[in-house]
Amino acid sequence: TFTLTVHPEIDLSMNQTRLTATVDKIFVTDISLQQFPQSEEIVYNLIHAPENMRIDTIGVVSWLPLPTQVDDYNFEIEVTDGIASTLLQYSIYVNAPPVISLRPPEIFILPEGEKLDFSLESFDLNSNTELEWKLLSGPMEMTLNQQGGLNWSGSDLGHHPYEIQLSDGIDSVQWKASIYVNTPPVFTSTPITVVPEGERYEYHLSAKDENTISPYDSLVGNEIIFSLAQGPDSMKIDENNILVWETEDNPPGEYM
């Protein structure tokens, strides 16, 4: 007579084997098993897996996919107790988030009365992906089509924030920005065009601007800054916004 012992099999059927990972994000999954009674020692082995994938002694798989490791990866995990052995076939799709490669400046200056017509551009490291543009928020009448065309006609001066999203169906990226509708400042002072020979020329500059908020900070008031674009060498604008020119070294005539 003899005794025949039937060794229990290792059941891995409860594991989900089609998974998704994202480039540059840690991917972790646990291997579950059923065995009655369970053997004291279980060994896990990766077969044909990516070089930088690891599995520890309790069946935890970890992987940090690189940008060069996009799309589908198929590999196997062997689970054995030295007698029974079961293979689990895995398929992981590595997704790279889409990239908005061309977009307006974070603060886009739009002259009053003009129309915003900007073509956003994108790319995705994955092959055969369909990207979707979406306008998450924005001013009234702003539109964003599926070709990345961002359009708006606005007349209200100041900041108009908006947010767009680009999605590949798995991951998405967002872009927050603002359109600043601007009207140019207007001089309210009248220039002095004649000065007696040898005397000091002074012209008090003043101007107004219908934009009351700074284009660069929506929490700061607007500021008018005067600068001299052209003039005689000794002409300058002082700290009190006075255009000053010492004329004693200049002969009579017209100066621009």
Predicted segments — roles?
Residues E51-L66, M140-G154, D233-E248:
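Strand-loop-strand motifs at the edges of beta-sheets in extracellular beta-sandwich domains
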Residues L33-V43, F123-E132, K208-I225:
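Extracellular acidic loop/turn motifs
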Residues Q16-A21, P105-L110, T190-V195:
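Short beta-strand segments of immunoglobulin-like
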Residues D71-F75, G158-Y162, G253-M256:
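Exposed beta-strand face motif in extracellular beta-rich ectodomains
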Residues I26-L33, K115-S122, R200-A207:
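A short beta-strand segment in extracellular, disulfide-stabilized domains
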Residues P8-L12, P50-M53, P98-I100, P105, ...:
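Proline-centered linker/hinge motifs at extracellular inter-domain junctions
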Residues T1-H7, T86-N95, S172-V181:
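C-terminal edge beta-strand
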